């Protein structure tokens, strides 16, 4: 298992791919208990990394604001809730 510090270096896609692999291994139920705990902890770190990257991307997304005539006037933070 890789060093937890390297999770911070992973791209979203790489972290998500590894997380999906961990979930599959745990769901299969063929991993010994001690190893299950270790890969679960790795999965938690990967989940946090993915959430961090998604929050960062969300903060960068803007919506285009328009005037009454529909002409662009600028941008504003995108309200996704």
Curated annotation (Swiss-Prot):
Leading EC class: hydrolase
Pfam families in the cross-refs: Exonuc_VII_S (PF02609)
Gene Ontology terms: biological process: DNA catabolic process
InterPro entries named among the record's database cross-references: Exonuc_VII_S (IPR003761), Exonuc_VII_ssu_sf (IPR037004)
Catalysed reactions, semicolon-separated: Exonucleolytic cleavage in either 5'- to 3'- or 3'- to 5'-direction to yield nucleoside 5'-phosphates
GO cellular component terms given for this protein: cytosol; exodeoxyribonuclease VII complex
Keywords: Cytoplasm, Exonuclease, Hydrolase, Nuclease
Molecular function per GO: exodeoxyribonuclease VII activity
Cystine pairs: none
Domain of life from the UniProt record: Bacteria
Subunit description: Heterooligomer composed of large and small subunits.
Described purpose of this protein according to its UniProt entry: Bidirectionally degrades single-stranded DNA into large acid-insoluble oligonucleotides, which are then degraded further into small acid-soluble oligonucleotides.
Protein name, per record: Exodeoxyribonuclease 7 small subunit
Organism field: Rhodopseudomonas palustris (strain BisA53)
């Amino acid at each position: 298992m890789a060093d937890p510090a390297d999770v911070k270096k992973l791209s979203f896609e790489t972290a998500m791919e590894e997380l999906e692999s961990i979930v599959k291994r745990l769901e299969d139920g063929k991993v010994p208990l001690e190893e299950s705990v270790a890969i679960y902890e790795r999965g938690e770190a990967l989940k946090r990394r993915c959430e961090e990257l998604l929050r960062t991307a969300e903060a960068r997304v803007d919506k285009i604001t328009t005037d009454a005539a529909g002409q662009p006037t600028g941008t504003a933070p995108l309200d996704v809730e």
